[in-house]
Amino acid sequence: GRGADGHEKRDSETTSTLSTTDTPGHGDFITTSSSPNDWRSPQNDNLWQGVDGVNNPCPVGFRLPTEAEWEAERTSWDSNDSAGAFGSPLKLPVAGYRGVDGSLYGVGSYGGYWSSSVDGASARGLGFVSSDAGMGSDYRAGGVSVRCLKD
C-alpha cells in the first residue's frame, strides 16, 4: 500500500498553503480554491511517472498505472460500472474522493483511482459509479485512491 506519510489518510489535517516543492514535507491535505487547482505551485507534470517518479505514492519497486493500463483493466470487467470494478480481481471499492476543499464526497457511491498520466493542468484517473465507468480528468489537488503496480 501507500507509504505512511499522512497522505494515505482520508481525514488528515488540511492546509491552504501550496507547496513550492515536489515533496511538501508534511502529511496535510493541501486545499485550494483557485485555478489550476493544484497542490503544487508551479505545477510539475513529472511527479508520478515510473517507479523512480518524484513523490511516487507507491512503495519502492511499485508505480501508479498509466491511463492506458487503467483503461485495459476497465475493459476487462464484466460490466462498465462500480459493480464491475468491485467484481474484478482488484476488488476496487467506491471509497469516494476528497475535494479540493478537503471535504469527503461520494463515499459508497463513487470510486476514483489516480493514474500517472496528466492532461494539461489536470491529472487523469479512472472513475466509476453505479451506472458508468471511464477515464477522466480531475483537479490535481483532489484526492482519490491509488493502486500500485509492481514494476
Segments from the language model and where they lie:
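Low-complexity, Gly/Ser/Thr/Pro- and Asn/Asp-enriched, turn/coil-prone segments
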Residues: G1-R40
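C-terminal, surface-exposed recognition/capping segments
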Residues: A4-D5, T31-T32, P36-N56, V60-D151
